[in-house]
Amino acid sequence: MQQFWTTLLGGLTLGAVYAAFALALCLIWRSTRVVNFAQAPMAMVTTYVGLEVIDSTGSYWLGFVVALAAGLVLGAVVERGLVRFVEGKSDLNVVILTLGLFVVLHSLAAIVFGQDYKSFPAPFSLQGLHVGGHNLAITGFGVFTLIAVAVVFVLLVALFRFTDLGLKMRASAFSPEVARLLGVRVGKMLTLGWALAAVVGSLAGLLVAGGSLVFPQFMDSVVVYGFVAAVLGGLDSPAGSVVGGLVLGLALSFVSGYAASDLVPITALGILVLVLLVRPGGLFSHVAERRV
Amino acid sequence: MTRTTRRGHRFRRPAGAAALLLVGALALAGCGRDASSREPAAAGDTTGVTDTSIKVGATFPLTGVAAPGYSTIPKGAQAYFDYVNDNGGVYGRKIDYIVKDDAYNPTTTSSVTNELVLKDQVFAMLGALGTPTHEAVVDFLNSSKVPDIAVSSGSVTWGDDPKEHPWTFGWQTDYESEGKIIGKWIADNMPKARVGLFLQNDDFGASGEKGLRDYIDKQIVAVSKYTPGGTDVTPQIAALQAKKADLVVGFNVPSYTALSQLVAMKLNYKPQWFYTNVGSDPTLVGSLLANFSKGQVKNGAQLLDGVMSTAYLPDVSNTSNPWIQTFDKIWKSNGSGGALTNYELYGMSQAYMFVQALQATGKDLTREALVKTLEEKGGDFTGPVFAPYRYSADSHLGTSGMKVVKIEGGQVKDVTGVETTDIGDADITESSESESTPPADGIPPAE
Amino acid sequence: MTAVKRVWGIPLVRHLVIGVVALVVVLFVLSSLSPFRNAQMATMAYLAIAAGGLTVLTGLSGQLSLGHGAFLAVGAYTTAYLLKDPDPPLPLVVIMLVSVAVALVVGGVVGVAAARLKGPYVAGATLALAVAVPALVRYLHGFGQEQGLHVIVPDVPRWFTDIVWQITGVDVDPVSYVAYLGWIALIVTFILLANLMRSRTGRTWRALRDNDVAAEIAGITLGRSRVLAFVMSTAAAGLAGSLMALSVRVAAPSGFPVDLSLTLLSAVVLGGLGSLTGALLGSALLTFLPQAVTNWGSSAGLSDVQSAELAPVVYGLIMMAVILLAPAGVVGSLRHAWQRRRGLA
């Protein structure tokens, strides 16, 4: 029974990280209709920046804030400096551009930050929490992860549902021409979408790294499973991203603990195919496929 | 498997003059067949050897998932060769050490090994790393008759069958023998322990398990396997905890030693840990864990205290060991900066053994002569390794034994003497050989 | 003259003539190269075959696959499985065809599922596939787990050596044998693909890519066309995988990382989406560029690790530059320039 609860809690925290990553993908999809494959390496770079700050100042929270700020800047720079030039062209062009960026950032990070393992501190205890004499298989940092993802989710929903800005962002992504006619500064909105998504991506990076090891490939498994989680939920829905992430995290954790770790990827594929065959737009796709 | 070249063809004429012309034109345009097809001299193959140099090739993961740690091994070898070269080289020949990146991908290993052998024309390969990666090139190296020395992997494939691979030699203690030595120690000293296994999901874990089961088959209560680079290992450790394993033997890489310790802390799981030589590296893992203490791990450095392990080489933390002193001095004069690590020590030790073999081969260096030296004299080589290499005409396996050690206060303390064994049903015996000391200048003497 | 022109106008005839000429040229080029260059040519051949298939899928039918490495794995493992013993049960050519068939069947299953999905969802599913297949072969028994299967390349058949000798006057060694096989397979594949692209099917694909709704209104069955494109590209990947196993001499899970799938995609992009010549050029770049860049890096005084990382940086940058500056790819841009010049003259 203890193993069950441990695996469950492990799966939840793992799933929360996938959810954070999926939320970043969802945000950028909602605001620009682009899948950013360079999300993970961008987060990897900002996490390294955060680590440098932590190592030189000794303050976790300063590093945390700097990493998020670095994400904001990096996101905006990538949109302004690269993606801007292929906007409105074939979707494939943007995808390939971000794949190119993926490769470049990965290798540059190895050159700049080195290939070694580095430990990334956590602001909270890495020991299991003690509740009523029992050890819970979740650390203070694990709880922080869950809360952070919940907060981001609520903020995102609020942004798109209750603010003018969110509406403008969606309009710019959905139909730039119409949005422009209505006086929305589409360019600004796209930049903002990339910047905010990169902040959420940086947060995902910090959550993966905290209390664990950092090296240029540390986000690799998140690239695949975070993306699968986003697609699982339906790229367009923040709730879908969170549910997709948690479902995937739990499933993978149980398969890894009770069956075999080599079955993890095929399980992810199986779940994804099953869901997509029933609902080709993902779990939370409420809008019928857009028709011309 | 032998391949025959059919010389008969050489006497035939190609179809037409036009064809000949085309061949000529293309040969001029492209790069023609070069020296690679030259016939070796009767005395033996001297490819890669000149009066002033010896070309040596190596493949390592310098990029990708396996790069952290492993990418620094060749720095150690490079430092040692630079030191030897600064001191006049071997019989006046300087060692030209060429390292290629294979990203731990067999496809890349194959292409860069082609490049080393066919284009760069190396004399020998030294320390090529990895089981699946080297598997891709071992037949090619053997059919090309390239000495393939000190493969950086503990698979028994590297040396258990010299008839199949006469040019390939292993180096470190194979994982099966290591499993046997750990298994026997547990059977003798902790016969009541409930043993859980934490295994890397490949040949490393599988061979280790095989060796362990020779001695403690009945004591093993749980086996958990992880895939490197996969998802978090909480479920694996939870499975060991659920079976109430109070002694966990880990056949895992160093990063997973750190990760399994962090998970155990999360689960409040406190078994006795026994990591293999590959995974223990107290300096590396200890410093990784110690860094967390800046966060909230209060006893980061002490997490490894009391952890058992094995050793076939002295640890860099053991500064009173004369080999460590010698290599440290060489690292300071010729290394690429920073404190000497166990990875670099590993590379230096391989390079030392290689120079030893070159010295013992003598002035007339050929590929055949080098292999003959290793088979005839390699078993008597002394070096930083605790137990002798098993090199002979019947076995090309590397060093044959190790000590059981314990980590205390970041230092590696001996628990047993040197236990030697071999693969299969060979017994384990305590080695009677006294520990060797390095030559004064750190370079093995010429014969 | 007009008769010649008319015959030349038939795509099949044109492609066959080009194919035969290419075959002769390839024989002479390969026979004049060093074993190392031959090994590189073998690599280029299998990359080009896979990239050719991906060109049909991505460039023509507009579907993005991030998991074609998985189909290479299927082809490679089929070949390796049949060649793990010194006495293969089937002739090599049949083994290669079996590998194609297995990849084709797997591709069919995946293609049917993928045809229902839109862009990013196909990408997600294929990405998961790229990770799942290597993990699955690691898990299953009989595929050698992490070490993979050893491939024993059959001896060069006597008749083959004889033919090559008769034409070029050079013996065939085991390394160049794989290069010959690869390039013959490449030429055959490209003739087939070129015909397909010129055919009604090819036009259908283009229509789909450019506007699927309009195409459907025009009476094109979306699903069937998409699946066909998918299956064609996976068959090509299966053949590529088979040749990869022969040239690498091992089929192991670590040989099929996600990077492989991305690499293939970049080969398609570098040359130009939708052009087979582009795929050829892209695979040439991928084969020869890393080595050149790495060597340049070490001679420029970078450390081994840094120069090893330099190759991906350069090809990633080229990939981005191509998309930003010449979205039609190198071949496409040259073609445009040529057409413009002719138009002016």
Map each language-model feature to its residues.
Chain B
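Immediate post-signal peptide segment of exported/extracytoplasmic ligand-binding proteins
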Residues: 38-58, 89-94, 187-193, 364
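Extracellular/periplasmic periplasmic-binding protein-like sensory domains
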Residues: 264-348, 440-441
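Extracytoplasmic "Venus flytrap"
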Residues: 40-78, 100-107, 129-130, 198-206, ...
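Short, low-complexity disordered leader/linker segments with a strong preference
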Residues: 1-55, 430-447
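Beta-alpha junction/loop-to-helix N-cap segments that form part of ligand/metal-binding clefts
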Residues: 40-44, 68-75, 87-161, 171, ...
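Extracellular/periplasmic Venus flytrap/periplasmic-binding protein
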Residues: 107-111, 155-157, 164-268, 318
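Segments of small-molecule ligand-sensing domains
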Residues: 333-344, 355-414
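Periplasmic-binding protein-like
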Residues: 116-129, 147-151, 195-199, 244-254, ...
